[in-house]
């Protein structure tokens, strides 16, 4: 449990004002985001049957919260880590047209998360997915989509400034594109997270591309499941966050795997046993559209725009009492 206490922290808004600001940010952002990317809101599951292969395996070591239900005692059911694969199936199931897509309010539990200022076991994000043509599976499509998302986030900065000028955290005016290999080449002696901090402190906002594959050093920058993002066409939107003196990830996204790239990545990840799961069979049999998608952290975005020191100020979760006590002593009011 690593907790950062900013010096002389002033939350600016009361707890009740913060709650109202959270509502405003969430409602305004999802409307603007949906319009800009041509996305429709869909209801989404909080849990899925384990056997479908629809849950997000994250880095491959986290275990989902699972249970059985009275009317289906033989079926193992998992609370989702994310909806990365479910969304792609939903686009097919509900006949979304080319260049249209969906977003949903995703709530997840990641019980193996290491708790700190920005990590919680409760995850709330706008999960989104959009149909693209096979010919659009390239860096140009990825970068254009990132620029659109950045534009919406910048627009939200203005909206928050208009309503809460005393509280808004000011963002950089542009986003820069850097690959994980470029980062390793430049900062070979730093850890991956230290590299992210260094480049974000220098540039303000970065889209860090190509996460999941092995770098020249033989190490990975970070883990990614092998069966949704194409590791050559994905990345994270990171902001330098002055209150915590570190990079803050707001979104993880990417162009999704093709049949070929999924097989390649499953082999690299030694996860070829997944090929026989229903989701993977649908993809291999050309039954799913080519897509781009990702997740945007709702609490993280609120935290960023309001200059909060702890994600627990903008979401209700469970925290160690020692963390709660230390936060309260320093004007950090955990919900």
Swiss-Prot record:
Domain of life according to the entry: Bacteria
Coiled-coil segments on the chain, per record: none
Places the protein is found: Cytoplasm
Alphabetical keyword list: Amino-acid biosynthesis, Asparagine biosynthesis, ATP-binding, Cytoplasm, Ligase, Nucleotide-binding
Top EC class for this record: ligase
One biological process term in Gene Ontology: L-asparagine biosynthetic process
Catalyzed reaction equations: L-aspartate + NH4(+) + ATP = L-asparagine + AMP + diphosphate + H(+)
GO molecular function: aspartate-ammonia ligase activity; ATP binding; catalytic activity, acting on a protein; transferase activity
Enzyme Commission number(s) from the entry: 6.3.1.1
Gene3D superfamilies linked: Bira Bifunctional Protein, Domain 2
Annotated metabolic or biological route of this protein: Amino-acid biosynthesis; L-asparagine biosynthesis; L-asparagine from L-aspartate (ammonia route): step 1/1
Annotated Gene Ontology cellular component terms: cytosol
Matches recorded under InterPro entries: aa-tRNA-synth_II (IPR006195), aa-tRNA-synth_II/BPL/LPL (IPR045864), AsnA (IPR004618)
HAMAP family: AsnA
Similarity remark: Belongs to the class-II aminoacyl-tRNA synthetase family. AsnA subfamily.
Name under which the protein is recorded: Aspartate--ammonia ligase
Organism, as annotated: Pediococcus pentosaceus (strain ATCC 25745 / CCUG 21536 / LMG 10740 / 183-1w)
Gene: asnA
